[in-house]
Amino acid sequence: MSAYSMLSERIAMAKELIKRAESLSRSKKGGIEGGAKLCSKLKSELKFLQKIESGKVAIKESHLQSTNLTHLKAIVESAENLEEVVSVLRVFGYTDSLGEKQTLVVDVVANGGHTWVKAIGRKAEALHNIWLGRGQYGDKSIIEQAEDFLQASRQQPVQYSNPHIVFAFYNSVSSPMADKLKDMGISVRGDIVAVNSLLNHPEEYLLSESESDDEGQELLQVTRVDLDNVLARVAFPTEIKVDVCRRVNLDITTLITYVSAMSYGGCHFIFKEKVLTEQAEQERKERVLPQLEAFMKDKELFACESAVKDFQSILDTLGGPGERERAAVLIKRINVVPDQPSERALKLVASSKINSRSLTIFGTGDTLKAITMTANSGFVRAANNQGVKFSVFIHQPRALTESKEALAVPLPKARTNDSAH
């Protein structure tokens, strides 16, 4: 293929990838974190290729074999093939084995955060050679990168379990490397190809003692990837087993939302309080109760004593008869436990968003290793800003409204029917 036809092909590929990346970003309500960054990187690649096309930059084969574009294509393809993608090109901070602060870029975070994917576009030969010490100085082997991923994932638990790591190879991977990754607990996606021993090996394939590690020595130093001999074609795991957390800690905001008259059809009013009218409008558009029930299904429910006590106090003051009745039924389903905030929760500095009550509730959930259900997103963000990330399920709030209905204006029948649940 001539350089110019290769250039045209690359430009077409970049344009197509931009469309696919933009489509990916739109596929999730609220967008995918990092989607704009991915599109921006692709547009930069396209701009550079167009400069070559216009003659502003001299044409070189190395430019056309851009590893950036290959890598970005691998990211797009990975994201398209995974469920519940939450972010792309996500940067995580972690501490390495020497105690140094490091950062790691995860190409695709999927499965609601439970799966980390590294998308690899480089050819199997290059990856295999780097592993065996035949790469350029400073090249980090895939196995070394896998160790970084494992180290970082242990420090970024999602709902109290470490993310599962998948290395997705789009230009094959050698069988020994795939085996090593699997031994490390990493899933492999892509074509797994054989390697052949070189019986009449030239001198340059031999590794000096200083260049190789024990692992490399052990593993046939003189091997060559055989791309024609595909041993296995491995697709993305369709169902990655995730240790689903079965414990749920209920915040006061969730207890109130769960029993609110508004959650049971009482949303067809214009209330005197603007905030209640806004909540009613939100409820007509999107019901909250089915979301809460779906998340709570088959899980053990907990609430700390402070949460239940304050909930009862609010209920006694503002609750209507139906809301109190539903609350009595709900409390019977809950394991009420003593307040026991975790150490890391107690280290939080008080602020307008972080008060002792929230700290106790979320901290108790942390001690229980439970996911805290809450409408208090302000606390979650404030804690996150202080470096404490709680496992949470965030939903929209609903206030106790049964006693307010008498003074509210019912919506006209037509509007009620249009937005009926």
UniProtKB/Swiss-Prot annotation:
Residues annotated as signal peptide: none
Pfam families with a match to the protein in the record: DUF1308 (PF07000), DUF5614 (PF18474)
InterPro entries attached to this UniProt entry: DUF1308, DUF5614
Superkingdom, taxonomy of origin: Eukaryota
Family statement: Belongs to the UPF0415 family.
Name of this protein: UPF0415 protein C7orf25 homolog
